[in-house]
């Protein structure tokens, strides 16, 4: 019996909303640990959004492919920073399915390097979203899974492309902000 896997559209619909996040990052190269907390908001964007159309243009898409567009914004505070100032940013992701469980992700900025980046995604047999991005000197592998409808877990590994050594790992626990769901 074949299991019907969750589709990328279903995974994204489950991810929409506001999340509270706690992340621990281990920099193996510098033997340092960073802990951070953040508020993350994931919104679906319309296909005719000017930023979405601009991103498609940057990737030289002349026709409009089938895609799901997201805006992810965050505000974070880290124990890495001495002054404990709040960092904030946002990114746009376009998921272009090749089939119901795998495809390409286009971003206006990368996860490990602040340049536009293209990734491959796959939803595995455990319904985890796996995203792999190859940059000029590093590769990022990220896995996002739902532990329940309101709890997500993210794991990431950054490797050196030259010798495949692990440079950094991180684990993030995300809890949906339930207060915004109440009337």
Swiss-Prot record:
This entry's Enzyme Commission designation comes to: 4.-.-.-
The record's GO molecular-function terms, alphabetically, read: lyase activity
Highest taxon listed in the record's lineage: Bacteria
Q: Which Pfam family, any one of them, does this sequence belong to?
A: CpeS
Q: Which family does it belong to?
A: Belongs to the CpcS/CpeS biliprotein lyase family.
Which keywords fit this entry according to its UniProt record? Lyase
Q: Does the keyword Lyase apply?
A: yes
Protein's UniProt name? Phycoerythrobilin lyase CpeS
Question: What is the main EC category here?
Answer: lyase
Q: Which organism is it from?
A: Prochlorococcus marinus subsp. pastoris (strain CCMP1986 / NIES-2087 / MED4)
Query: Which InterPro entries does its entry note?
Result: Calycin, CpcS/CpeS
Task: Answer yes or no on keyword Transferase.
Answer: no
């Amino acid at each position: 019996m074949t299991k019907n896997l969750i589709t990328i559209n279903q995974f994204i619909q489950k991810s929409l909303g506001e999340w509270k996040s706690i992340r621990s990052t281990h920099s193996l190269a510098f033997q340092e640990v960073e802990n951070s907390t953040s508020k993350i908001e994931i919104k679906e964007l319309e296909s005719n959004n000017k930023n979405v159309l601009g991103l498609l243009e940057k990737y030289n898409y002349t026709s409009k492919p089938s895609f799901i567009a997201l805006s992810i914004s965050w505000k974070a505070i880290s124990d890495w920073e001495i002054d404990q100032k709040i960092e904030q940013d946002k990114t746009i992701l376009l998921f272009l399915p090749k089939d119901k469980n795998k495809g390409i992700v286009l971003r206006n900025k990368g996860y490990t390097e602040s340049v536009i980046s293209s990734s491959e995604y796959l939803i595995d047999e455990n319904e985890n979203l796996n995203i792999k991005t190859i940059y000029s000197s590093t590769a990022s592998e990220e896995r996002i899974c739902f532990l329940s409808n309101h709890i997500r877990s993210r794991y990431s590994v950054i490797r050196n492309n030259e010798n495949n050594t692990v440079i950094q790992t991180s684990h993030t626990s995300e809890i949906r902000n339930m207060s915004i769901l109440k009337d």
